[in-house]
Design a protein with these regions (language model features):
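Glycan-recognition and processing domains
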Residues: 24-59, 74-77, 105-115, 151-170
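Short acidic/polar inter-strand loop motif in beta-rich domains
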Residues: 75-77, 139-146
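Short coil-to-beta strand junction motifs in C2/discoidin
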Residues: 78-86
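Short strand-turn-strand beta-turns centered on an Asx-Gly dipeptide
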Residues: 89-95
């Protein structure tokens, strides 16, 4: 057998072993998650939840890294950048998230075909061990609700030669 065959098998095995370690899962709201928006992004269906007046509440077990992926709906004719924002309540602490992105033309909505959506605004939070409550609240000076999805990724285990750095907040 040639070395090319062995090399391609080795690359495949390494790729799948890395993919299994970096598994991410979509989090579903535990409260007020009945309303959903299905967006088609690169021929894949992605589930987003609008942040309405009641907010969205999630219960998450740590340690994990939470990714907040948000988009803002815009009518089809608009092309400029659009600012949108929301608030995160994490175990009683408040974080205000502000984004400003251009409209991405390739995204379509099943429920709202006359809307386009901005590029995604991503925000990350690392959670320590334990159970955490995350509440997402709207900021009311916006015309449309912000659409959001939360993805949870587990941390890889620390080896003896790695050091965990903690940021200092003043």
């Amino acid at each position: 057998m040639s070395q090319i065959v062995y090399y391609s098998k080795l690359v495949t095995i390494v790729f799948f072993s890395l993919a299994l370690q970096l598994e991410a899962r979509l989090l579903k709201p535990t409260k007020n998650g009945e309303e959903k928006e299905v967006l088609i992004i690169n021929d894949k269906r992605r589930l987003y939840y609008p942040i309405r007046d009641g907010g969205l509440e999630y219960s998450v077990k740590g340690p994990s890294r939470i990714e907040f992926i948000s988009r803002y709906p815009v009518l089809k004719g608009k092309k400029k950048s659009h600012a949108f924002k929301y608030r995160i309540l994490l175990d009683g602490d408040t974080i205000s998230v502000n984004h400003k992105y251009k409209v991405q033309r390739t995204i379509k909505s099943v429920q709202h075909p006359r809307h386009k959506y901005t590029y995604s605004g991503n925000y990350f939070i690392n959670l320590q061990e334990g159970t955490h409550t995350i509440t997402l609240l709207p900021i009311n000076d916006q015309k449309y609700p912000v659409l959001i999805r939360l993805i949870s990724k587990e941390f890889e285990s620390l080896r003896k030669d790695k050091i965990f750095l903690k940021p200092m907040i003043h």
